[in-house]
Regions:
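A generic structural signal for short beta-strands and their flanking turns/coil linkers
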Residues: 3, 24-26, 36-38, 48-50, ...
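Structured adenosyl-cofactor binding patch, chiefly the S-adenosyl-L-methionine
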Residues: 190-225
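Active-site/ligand-binding-proximal alpha/beta "capping" segment
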Residues: 152-193, 202-204
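Hydrophobic side chains in well-ordered alpha-helices
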Residues: 16, 79-82, 192
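N-terminal positively charged helical leader segments and presequences
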Residues: 1-59
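RNA substrate-binding interface of SAM-dependent RNA methyltransferases
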Residues: 60-158
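Glycine/charged-rich beta-loop-alpha catalytic/anionic-binding loops adjacent to active sites
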Residues: 6-10, 64-68, 176-179, 198-206
Length: 225
């Protein structure tokens, strides 16, 4: 009704009981999905529900990063963790892309069902105390992406391709709209890198270490922004 809220799902109830160790009468920070944040008083808490009396819910969520992340589809378990991490860091636009070294079987994973993706995004938002869900797009072909999506994505963004062996190091502290492209575990193949550079992207590297995708993405976002 705009003044009260109810939680009934087991995961969040367990979090209130075991992590917050909340008690009736506690004031907690809350957020409305897609909306603002603020404070609420916990008026009832039991095994089946939590009731809140909402106060002024008018605080904006944390600012988003000015980045559209294009990520070669990782293996399913890593996809789940990566979605949570990048959502917590403030990424609001994500494209999952097929490349030569992405196993085709990954596209059949239950982790790509809309409800599973939504679940991982929610976990990332909760971790960061954010309310704005990212947009996730699936692109199952590299050539169609290059021809139909990349030109528009680059019109108002600086394109950066993260790939070992590139000449330039990853820039630091940039504050401009950016398109960040990250390859799969084995990296982009040379032809893919050539196509991306020819389209106007800049190549860059994170140093001599070869990192797992989830580690590399976190490091890139932290360094860039």
């Amino acid at each position: 009704d705009g003044h009260h809220a109810r939680i009934t799902d087991a995961r969040r109830l367990t979090h209130l009981h075991e992590v917050h160790r909340a008690n009736e009468g506690d004031r907690l920070t809350v957020g409305i999905q897609g909306g603002a944040m603020g404070k609420a008083t916990l008026t009832e808490l039991n095994k089946t529900q939590a009731l809140f009396a909402l106060e002024d819910i008018n605080e904006p969520p944390p600012p988003a990063l000015p980045v559209h992340l294009v990520l070669a589809l990782p293996r399913p378990r890593m996809l789940a963790r990566t979605l949570e991490h990048v959502t917590a860091l403030g990424v609001k636009d994500i494209t999952l892309l097929h490349t030569k070294r992405v196993e085709k079987s990954y596209w059949q994973s239950p982790e790509l069902r809309p409800e599973k993706i939504h679940q991982h995004l929610i976990l990332g938002l909760e971790q960061a105390r954010d309310t704005q869900l990212p947009n996730v797009t699936l692109c199952k072909g590299f050539r169609p992406f290059m021809e139909e999506q990349l030109p528009a994505l680059l019109t108002e963004r600086r394109g950066l391709v993260a790939h070992p062996g590139m000449e330039n190091a990853c820039p630091r502290g940039i504050d401009e709209p950016t398109l960040l492209l990250v390859g799969p575990e084995g990296g982009f193949i040379p032809w893919e890198v050539e196509q991306l550079l020819a389209a106007g992207c800049e190549g860059m590297h994170l140093g001599p270490r070869i990192l797992r995708v989830e580690t590399a993405v976190t490091a890139l976002l932290s360094r860039l922004f």
